[in-house]
């Protein structure tokens, strides 16, 4: 009886293990999206990507949109994340702590870099970054390079001290706060115009505020920042990483992929990348004290 029970338990464990293999319905590949823009846009994009990947790879996927960048970083630390579309700073932290790998980079109209932009209302009297001194200012998130870290470094280096600062948590929220006069100035991501249309964060609220280009002006730009990466858990099977990367690049070239990615921070494509492409920014973040 004991022998039969032992054999049964071994077989049961084996079946359970098989059911729990990564990519099965019981253990889908867990794909996280950074909450940098409106959740509805993220849901639209992630749903389309999930549908495409499940049709073009042999695996199942589960999409998650947490409340912060850091939640994604820690999800890698507890093996709750396999892939993530993450901001550059979050990736740098996750790479340092958990060895995640950057395999893909977003591309915007052929550009693989972007910048931070300082914004102010056109009627505010704020004409340059130095005028922010003593004013109320909105940042995006403490883990955002374009929405906090590099702008903060500029302010500190030039001895510019806002009277009050707030975190809006999303780039479009910052633009809205500046537009509505809730703050005097703010910082968000910037990409140059394409075909006569703005591609910076103001574009995200243009449907709601058609005159945002006239009401909210750019008063300064930062140095170049590499575009956000798609990252993978370091011990995820290499076959999976390669296949998923190939299919994601193909997805970005489809009509549906182009539609959902473009509405998401003006992304127009995905290209291969490596951790080395982020070394310069990694060094800058370390200099800022962003990595202990």
What are these regions (language model features)?
Residues 29-35, 130-147:
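Short loop->beta-strand "edge-of-pocket" segments that line small-molecule binding or catalytic clefts
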């Amino acid at each position: 009886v004991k022998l039969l029970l032992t054999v049964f338990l071994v077989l049961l464990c084996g079946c359970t293990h098989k059911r729990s293999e990564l990519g099965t319905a019981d253990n889908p590949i867990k794909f996280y999206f950074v909450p940098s823009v409106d959740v509805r846009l993220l849901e639209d994009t992630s749903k389309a990507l999930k549908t495409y990947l499940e049709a073009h790879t042999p695996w199942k996927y589960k999409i998650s949109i947490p409340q912060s960048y850091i939640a994604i970083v820690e999800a890698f630390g507890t093996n709750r994340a396999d892939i993530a579309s993450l901001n550059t700073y979050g990736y740098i932290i996750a790479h340092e702590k958990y060895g995640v790998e950057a395999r893909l980079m977003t591309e915007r109209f052929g550009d693989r870099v972007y910048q931070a932009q300082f914004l102010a209302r056109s009627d505010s009297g704020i004409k340059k970054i130095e005028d922010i001194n003593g004013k109320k200012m909105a940042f995006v998130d403490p883990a955002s390079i374009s929405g906090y870290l590099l702008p903060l470094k500029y302010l500190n280096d030039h001895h510019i001290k806002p009277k009050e600062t707030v975190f809006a948590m999303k780039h479009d929220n910052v633009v809205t706060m500046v537009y509505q006069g809730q703050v005097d100035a703010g910082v968000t991501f910037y990409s140059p115009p394409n075909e006569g249309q703005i591609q910076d964060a103001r574009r995200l609220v243009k449907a709601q505020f058609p005159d945002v280009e006239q009401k909210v002006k750019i008063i300064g730009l930062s140095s170049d920042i590499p575009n956000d990466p798609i990252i993978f858990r370091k011990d995820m099977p290499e076959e999976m990483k390669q296949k998923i990367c190939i299919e994601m690049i193909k997805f970005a070239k489809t009509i549906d992929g182009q539609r959902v990615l473009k509405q998401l921070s003006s992304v127009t494509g995905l290209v291969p990348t490596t951790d080395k492409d982020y070394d310069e920014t990694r060094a800058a973040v370390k200099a800022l004290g962003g990595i202990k």
